[in-house]
């Protein structure tokens, strides 16, 4: 007798004339298919979308920067003329620069009574400060008004991603127009190195920062009020890394199989229970159930 390979078939077929369709089974089947479709589309959406995973570690991620950080500053001083506005930079490596002018622009506003300062400059990766003041002016104004609006203050490159909402421009929109005219403003910044790595392994380097601020009246050694807008910074040793990840294909297939198999199994159990209960009820009504 020849060997019958069909004996390995665990999915034995039942002739249609031996099966019995029911309205309940049809309803359960339709609901089952809709439920599977919903879960499948949800899982497919999650599979297509990229997941952002973040981690912390101690290191300098941008070692090729030469120990420098690019800074972008955009601030408006509506009551201080451009000819007396300047940027000073100093740090613990001995840098002390008064009236920095490279890559900076001063735009007169309010009929030249005010100024919008835009600057792009570099700082060393050591604690220090940069400040907007009148220190570089030849003739000091009698009552320098340091009320201001900060449009942008950012460090490093701007990340070209939409799915990260970090503190890359934490001071953007800071409005100090309601403060006192002769007050100095002190912003203390903690700069946090940040790395973004996409699916292809390409890395982008930037910096987030936290900020605390206070306002006070400062006097020179001659007793004059010398207000300024100070940005005192220090670097955090902790680096934040964001990594794009996508769910592996095998996990997606496993989940889809679990959805389909689990749903059909539960639906089959439910249909069998309802059918058995309805048949028992019919027998009771016919008086056949003892």
Curated annotation (Swiss-Prot):
Would the keyword Transport be found if you checked this record's keyword annotation?
yes
Task: Identify its membrane topology class.
Answer: Multi-pass membrane protein
| One term under GO cellular component | Golgi membrane
Show the Pfam families listed in the entry. COPIIcoated_ERV (PF07970), ERGIC_N (PF13850)
- Segments crossing the lipid bilayer: 27-47, 255-275
Q: Name one GO biological process term.
A: retrograde vesicle-mediated transport, Golgi to endoplasmic reticulum
What are the record keywords, sorted?
Endoplasmic reticulum, ER-Golgi transport, Glycoprotein, Golgi apparatus, Membrane, Transmembrane, Transmembrane helix, Transport
Family according to the record: Belongs to the ERGIC family.
Biological function: Possible role in transport between endoplasmic reticulum and Golgi.
The protein's name is Endoplasmic reticulum-Golgi intermediate compartment protein 1
Upper classification of the source organism reads:
Eukaryota, Metazoa, Chordata, Craniata, Vertebrata
